[in-house]
A protein has these predicted regions:
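Generic preference for hydrophobic/aromatic residues in regular secondary structure cores
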Residues: 4-7, 100-106, 180, 189-191
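Short, surface-exposed, polar/charged, turn-prone segments marking secondary-structure boundaries
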Residues: 18-24, 76, 82-86, 132-133, ...
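Carbohydrate-binding surfaces of carbohydrate-active enzymes
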Residues: 45, 59-61, 65, 71, ...
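Flexible glycine/proline-enriched surface loops and loop-helix/loop-strand junctions
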Residues: 25, 48-49, 86-90, 212-220
Length: 233
C-alpha cells in the first residue's frame, strides 16, 4: 500500500486497495500481502531472465528491487502483515537477487515516507531535493542499439519530475547498469540486462505533472502531444 497508508488509511480508495490485495493474497495461497508482492517480484525477475522486456517507473523501480532483495528479510510495515519490520533488515538484504540496485539502506521507520536511500530526491521527506533537468546520453545505434532506441527523442535535455521514487543514487547502481540520463551524479533513467532479457527503470511519476499530488486529475495527453518525457515512455 506504499506509505500512503500513513496519511490515507481512512480513504475509500485505499481501503478498497487493501481489501483487493488481501483477497488476492488469500486466493493465491500467500500468507500475507507482502508475501504476495515478493512472489510477484520473483515472477517478474524470472520473466526478464527468460527473455522478457521490463519497463518500470516511479516507485515500481525501487520497491521491486527491495522486494527481490528482501527474500529472507521483513521490510514490511505492521499495517500490511501484522508484524513490525525487522530493525536489522538492511543487513539481511540479498542484493545478488536484485536486477539493478545494490547496497541500499532500507527505511523501516513508519514515520518517514521513503522506501530506502536508493532514491536520491526523497520527495516526501525533510531532505527532499529540488528538481532540475536531465540530459539524455547519446548512444551509437550501431554499437548500442537498445540504449540508442530508449533515448531517441526530439530534445536532448528534459525537465525533471517528482515521483515517490524520482531518481537513483549512482552508488546504488550495480556495475552492469547503463545510465541513459542523469542530473549531475544522480541517475534518472537506467537500463540493464539479466539473462536473456532487459530491464529499464525511469524515475518519476508524470513528465507533464512534475509535482503530482494525490487526487490530481489525470494528465490529458491530447494537450501534450510533443511531450519529450512521454516520448521516452
Amino acid at each position: 500500500y506504499s506509505k500512503f497508508f500513513l496519511t490515507y488509511a481512512g480513504s475509500p480508495w485505499l481501503q478498497e486497495e487493501v481489501s483487493r490485495n488481501e483477497e488476492m493474497a488469500e486466493r493465491l495461497g500467500f500468507g500475507s500481502v507482502p508475501d504476495l508482492k515478493k512472489g510477484v517480484a520473483r515472477r517478474l525477475r524470472q520473466y526478464v531472465d527468460g527473455g522478457g522486456f521490463l519497463l518500470a517507473m516511479c516507485s515500481a523501480t525501487e520497491t521491486l528491487e527491495l522486494a527481490l532483495g528482501a527474500e529472507h528479510a521483513d521490510i514490511a510495515a505492521s499495517y500490511s502483515d501484522g508484524s513490525p519490520p525487522d530493525p536489522n533488515a538492511t543487513s539481511k538484504m540479498e542484493w545478488d537477487l536484485t536486477m539493478g540496485f545494490m547496497d541500499g539502506v532500507v527505511q523501516t521507520s513508519p514515520s518517514v515516507n521513503a522506501f530506502s536511500d536508493i532514491d536520491a530526491h526523497q520527495v516526501n521527506t525533510p531532505w527532499r531535493l529540488e528538481l532540475g533537468v536531465f540530459p539524455l546520453f547519446d548512444f551509437s545505434a550501431k554499437f548500442d542499439p537498445v540504449p540508442a532506441m530508449l533515448t531517441q527523442n526530439h530534445v536532448s535535455v528534459i525537465s525533471d519530475f517528482y515521483g515517490l521514487t524520482t531518481s537513483f543514487r549512482m552508488d546504488r547502481l550495480k556495475p552492469g547498469a547503463i545510465v541513459l540520463a542523469k542530473d549531475g551524479n544522480i541517475a534518472k533513467y537506467v537500463h540493464g540486462n539479466l539473462g536473456e532479457g532487459t530491464w529499464t527503470y525511469f524515475g518519476g511519476h508524470d513528465p507533464e505533472d512534475p509535482e503530482h499530488q494525490i487526487g490530481d486529475p489525470p494528465t490529458n495527453l491530447d494537450l501534450h502531444r510533443s511531450s519529450p518525457g512521454y516520448r521516452l515512455i
